[in-house]
C-alpha cells in the first residue's frame, strides 16, 4: 500500500498545508496540541474536507479538489481510531467489534473472524462485558479490534495511549505493535510523545503550526531535526541562539561563547523538497541535548567550558543540573543530565564541561 497526501485547509488564522508519502510502514506525526495532526487524519478519513489538494491511497484517488473527487468515509475503507475510542455503551464488547465487520462480509465466518482478532489482542474474556465494565486500556484494544475486522486499507491511530498511565501505556504498545505487524499496511500514528514515537515508528514527520518541519527515519530526525521547534519536540532542552563564525564554528549569541561544530550535513528531506546543503550563515540556533553535556575527563576534550552549578533536580537515576558560564554566572546557559551516583560522589559548585561537536544540533528558522 502507498499513501500520498498533499492538502491544504484554512481555519481562520490557522492554515494547514501538508505534503507527505508513506508506504507499508509506520509513519508517526509528532507535534504539539493544535498543530494539525488530528485534522490531517480526519481529512484522510473523509471526516473533514480539505480546501484544496489530493489524497491517494494505493493508486485510488480519495480526494482531488480539481477533479471534484471526494469519496465518502465508507468508500475510503480507512481505519481511524479516535482518542476516546467511541465505543457503543449499550453493546457488549463482542457486539462492538462485530459492528466493525462490513455488511458485505457479515457471513457465517464473521463470528470466527471477530474471535480471532479478540484472541490476538488478548480480550477474549471480555466478550460479554460492556465498555463501562472494562478499563481504559481494554477499551482501547476493543476499539482497535473493531477497526481490524473491517479490513481497512490504512490504519490511523490518534494518540492511542494519551489517556493511559505510563506503565499501562508501555505494556499496550507491545500488543498494538504486534497487531500492526500483522496488519502489514500503512499506519499513521499521531502522537506528542517523542519516546513513544522513537520506540514504535519507522519514519516520523514533525508537524508545527500546520506545516511539516522535517520528515525522515526516526534516527535521522532525532539526529538532525532542522528547526528549533522540531528539536524541542524531539526532547532537546537546550536551544540557544547562535551565529556563524566560519564553517566549523558558531558563536552563542547570548553568551559570546564560540563552539566548534560539525559541518551541516543537510541529510534530511524537508516537506515537499529535496534536501540541499545548508549554508552556515542560515543557522540561527544550536540544540544541545542534556545528556550530551559531560564532565571533562581529558584536557584534550573539545568545547570545554567552566560553569557554575546554579541548581539541581534529582530524578530516580540522574540529576539535572542548571549551568551558567563562570564568566557570567547571572546568565543561565544550559541544563545537563548526569548519573546520580557520579554527581553524589563529585558534587561541586563549579564544573568543567565538554560538548562534542558531533553532538551539537545545527538549527535554522523556517
Spell out what each predicted region is.
Residues 45:
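Helix-to-loop junction immediately C-terminal to a conserved catalytic motif
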Amino acid at each position: 500500500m502507498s499513501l500520498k497526501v498533499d492538502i491544504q485547509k484554512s481555519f481562520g488564522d490557522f492554515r494547514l498545508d501538508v505534503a507527505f508519502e508513506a508506504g507499508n510502514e509506520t509513519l508517526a506525526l509528532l507535534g504539539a496540541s493544535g498543530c494539525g495532526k488530528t485534522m490531517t487524519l480526519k481529512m484522510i478519513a473523509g471526516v473533514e474536507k480539505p480546501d484544496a489538494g489530493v489524497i491517494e491511497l494505493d493508486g485510488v484517488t480519495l480526494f482531488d479538489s480539481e477533479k471534484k473527487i471526494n469519496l465518502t468515509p465508507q468508500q475510503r475503507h480507512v481505519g481511524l481510531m479516535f482518542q476516546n475510542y467511541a465505543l457503543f455503551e449499550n453493546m457488549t464488547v463482542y457486539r462492538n467489534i462485530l459492528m466493525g465487520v462490513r455488511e458485505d462480509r457479515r457471513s457465517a465466518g464473521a463470528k470466527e473472524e471477530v474471535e480471532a482478532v479478540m484472541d490476538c489482542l488478548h480480550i477474549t474474556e471480555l466478550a460479554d462485558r460492556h465498555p463501562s465494565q472494562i478499563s481504559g486500556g481494554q477499551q482501547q484494544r476493543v476499539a482497535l479490534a473493531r477497526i481490524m475486522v473491517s479490513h481497512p486499507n490504512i490504519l490511523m491511530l490518534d494518540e492511542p495511549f494519551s489517556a493511559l498511565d505510563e506503565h499501562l501505556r508501555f505494556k499496550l504498545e507491545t500488543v498494538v505493535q504486534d497487531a500492526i505487524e500483522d496488519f502489514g499496511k500503512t499506519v499513521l500514528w499521531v502522537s506528542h510523545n517523542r519516546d513513544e514515537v522513537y520506540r514504535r515508528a519507522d519514519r516520523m514527520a514533525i508537524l508545527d503550526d500546520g506545516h511539516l518541519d522535517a520528515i525522515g527515519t526516526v534516527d535521522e530526525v532525532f539526529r538532525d531535526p532542522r528547526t528549533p521547534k522540531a528539536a524541542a519536540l524531539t526532547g532537546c532542552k537546550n536551544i540557544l541562539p547562535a551565529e556563524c563564525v566560519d564553517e566549523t564554528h558558531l558563536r552563542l549569541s547570548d553568551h559570546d561563547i564560540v563552539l566548534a561544530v560539525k559541518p551541516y550535513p543537510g541529510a534530511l528531506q524537508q516537506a515537499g523538497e529535496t534536501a540541499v546543503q545548508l549554508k552556515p550563515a542560515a543557522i540561527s540556533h544550536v540544540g544541545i541535548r542534556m545528556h550530551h553535556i559531560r564532565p571533562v575527563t581529558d584536557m584534550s576534550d573539545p568545547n570545554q567550558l567552566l560553569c557554575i552549578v546554579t541548581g539541581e533536580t534529582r530524578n530516580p537515576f540522574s540529576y539535572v543540573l542548571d549551568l551558567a558560564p563562570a564568566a557570567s554566572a547571572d546568565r543561565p546557559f544550559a541544563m545537563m543530565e548526569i548519573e546520580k551516583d557520579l554527581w553524589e560522589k563529585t558534587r561541586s559548585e563549579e564544573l568543567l564541561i565538554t560538548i562534542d561537536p558531533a553532538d551539537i544540533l545545527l538549527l535554522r528558522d523556517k
